[in-house]
């Protein structure tokens, strides 16, 4: 049996000048990202010993066209780690806002298979909850997608008169806007969603 070294995506991107997309990088422990420091600062990748039969560590000069895109959720999200200051100092950070209404409608319509008129109501409901100023955490488009997909599976309609829709929307949005697990907050959130359903659906 013989060993065969296979370069990972990071090595390939550094070698050939590709763009590395590192999705939700703050889910990794900070020490797991240490190798990125020399790549971004000194433009050198430290390769492991015994790579391709070599006995000592060697280095790869990072291609001048190499770029990296890192995505992350805010640090207060469950499961995220605080990013190293040293790593943040080596990147440009852009805070992204929510999509505009038209884009959210298009995403929910295309990913759920619901009619555009129903996607509009879901988007307006989620956006109204965001703007209410009463959420511990603001609901994202994911909450709207979950509602839309659950409705499609259950054959329910986006209507204040549809009990299945009301339950689905209240359950998902109350859960999406709270991270503390407080029963009082959950009930308060369900009540707020019920009121918004009357206004927007």
Model-flagged regions — what are they?
Residues 1-201:
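C-terminal regulatory/interaction module of P-loop NTP-utilizing enzymes
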């Amino acid at each position: 049996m013989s060993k065969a070294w296979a370069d990972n995506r990071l090595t390939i991107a550094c070698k050939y000048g590709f763009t590395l997309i590192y999705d939700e990088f703050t889910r990794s422990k900070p020490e797991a990202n240490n190798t990125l420091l020399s790549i971004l600062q000194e433009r050198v990748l430290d390769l492991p010993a015994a790579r391709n039969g070599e006995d000592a560590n060697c280095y790869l000069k990072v291609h001048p066209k190499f770029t990296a895109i890192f995505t992350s959720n805010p640090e207060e999200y469950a499961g995220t780690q605080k990013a190293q200051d040293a790593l943040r100092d080596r990147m440009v950070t852009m805070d992204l806002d929510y999509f505009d209404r038209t884009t959210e409608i298009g995403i929910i319509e295309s990913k759920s298979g619901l009619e555009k008129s129903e996607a509009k109501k879901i988007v307006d409901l989620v956006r109204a909850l965001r703007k209410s100023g009463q959420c511990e955490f603001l609901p994202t488009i994911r909450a709207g997608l979950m509602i839309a997909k659950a409705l499609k599976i259950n054959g329910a309609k986006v209507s204040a008169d549809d009990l299945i829709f009301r339950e689905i929307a209240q359950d998902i949005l109350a859960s999406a806007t709270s991270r503390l697990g407080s029963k009082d907050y959950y009930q308060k959130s369900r009540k707020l969603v019920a009121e918004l359903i009357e206004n927007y659906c």
